[in-house]
Structures are given as C-alpha cells and as structure tokens.
C-alpha cells in the first residue's frame, strides 16, 4: 500500500530546471569569484617576488624644479672619465656613452651592449619617464621633452660630457633632437636601425593604412580590459608562454617584469601618440656636421605577407628597399663622416640579436671622437 510520502506531487519540470539553473549560476559565480581572487593574489605575490628577484639597476634622480615630481633612473658603469682631460690635445678627451632605447624597451634592454662597452668607456643607459624604475613624466611625450629630461638627468647625476650618444629605433629620434638642442655636448653618434622622420609617409599605401589602424589609441574599454588582465595575472601567464628565441630566459623575464606596470603602458602609448610631433622635431634638429656617425641597419624584415591584413609580399619588399636603400642611407648623410653598416643576420632588435655589432660601432665612433682635433 502506498505511503503518504509516495503520494506527494512531483514538482513540475520547469520548476526543476529553474532550480538547477539557479544552482549552476551560483556555482559559476562562486568559481568566477574564486578565479578573480586567485588571479589577483597570484599577481600580488608575483609582483613582490619580481621586486626581490629584479632589484633596481642604477640610481634614481629627481630632475629639479623644471620637472617637478619627475624622477629618472640612470644606470652608469665603466671607468669614470679622465678628470683633467685637455680638449685641445687630441686623444685626451674621454667621452661618456649614452644609450637611448627603442619604443617599449627599458634601459635594461641595453644589457648585452652596456656590459661590453663598460670595458673601455664610461657608459650610461636610462629609463625614460614611465619606463622601468623611472616615474611618469609630463605630457606630451615628444622627443623634445625627452631630450630636455635627459639633459637635466645627466646634469643632476654629475655625468659630464662630451657624449657619444646612441639611439635604437625611436631612440634615434631622441638622440638627434638632443644633439640639435645641445650640440656642444655631442661628439659622436650611433644610430641603430633608427626611426626616420619620413618613414610613415614613405610606406606603401596598404601598409600605411594598416600601420595607422594598428597605432590608433585603444578605447577606454580596451584599456580597462588590459588593466583587468594585468591585475589578474593573465598578462604574466601569457608572457610566460611566449617563445624567447635565443635570448636567456632570465633576461626576458626581467624585461617582462619592467614592462608590466600600468605606467609603462601609459608611457609607451603617449610616445606613440606623439610620434608625428617628434618626427617634426627631428626635421628641425638639423644635421651632425662632421661628427663621427655610424648607422646600423637591420638586414632582415620583421613582417610576413598578410601581416597586417591586406599587405602583400610586394608591399613588404618595397618597404624593405625604401628602409635599407633610401631612409637609412639618408641618415648616413647627416654627417660628412657618416658610415652605414648593414647587419645582414639581424632584425630590428639589433641590441638583442647582434649586440656585438653595436659594441663595435660604439668603439669605432668613440675612438674617432677621441682623436678629433
């Protein structure tokens, strides 16, 4: 005989589905909260481990009243310049070598170059405002602003000239503007696959449009998403999965650690947004006279057909030809003592891929600057 419990009505199917859906949503919400908390905790701990693993290389200097609240990191190594060099006697001047990085690369990116140059010269790399161990700087982030900050940094740090100045990629803009602003400081220059003030205008139309789209500032939603990914450790995880090629993993990990802060992202974006203004400042900087100059040019392109979309192999061949045979050659002619060297087995990141060629170029310009009357 059926019991009373057996005679209870069965809940409708719709009601059971609602119940299961509610439980599922509760479970997913709990899982999401757990993932967010776990990701944030992971990133919090990892950042503090980074601070222990990768202590500051160099020293921070406040730039003074002209640049309130701006502190830049300067990393100098090698022998101090001769204290009583007589500029009237050839061979007695000991220039200091100054290194300026490409867009998005902290001062530590010069490590392979700086370690070798320090064996024969005083050499300094620095983090531009917002990079590495430096504070954020005022907007706009043009090459003129960057040059003025570098000049103030060298003054407060007591790193006296003259200088052999070296610029990679966007750093080439900065060192040329610096030379135009402070010509008596500079006795020689090395440009390492350096940006050219006419490079955007000289690109084929398809690539110009693609690069313009790529350089369009991100939307507020994209910036928020990037910030969330950074705070939850997602950026860190993605970087850890990347191919480091032939570079030492410890070197790449330290570069990544310096690139993760929000201020770094803001600084690189600000420099990119001011690229056209910086190019105009380079045009106004003038030439180098008879200063020794070496232009290092990457022999290998960085893009493949279809990247960006719509770009053909012919477009890329045209870009490479214009870059190697025209724009880079024109930089060689900035000085009556200019020289160009193609680094056939390197792409754009010559300081990473062939640092020995950068060291050799610096050594040659350094020696020529010492011998100048």
What label would you give each PLM region?
Residues 98-102, 168, 193:
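The conserved beta1-alpha1 loop
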Residues 7, 14-15, 326, 334-373:
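Catalytic active-site module of serine/aspartate enzymes centered on a nucleophile-bearing elbow/loop
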Residues 25-60:
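An N-terminal hydrophobic leader/cap segment in hydrolases
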Residues 64-67, 75-82, 88, 128-166:
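Active-site loop/oxyanion-hole signature of alpha/beta-hydrolase fold enzymes
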Residues 143, 147, 182-186, 190-327, ...:
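Flexible "cap/lid" subdomain of the alpha/beta-hydrolase fold that forms the substrate-access gate
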Residues 50-71, 81:
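N-terminal cap/lid segment of alpha/beta-hydrolase-fold proteins
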Residues 167-171, 175:
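Gly/Ala-rich beta-loop-alpha elbow adjacent to hydrolase catalytic centers
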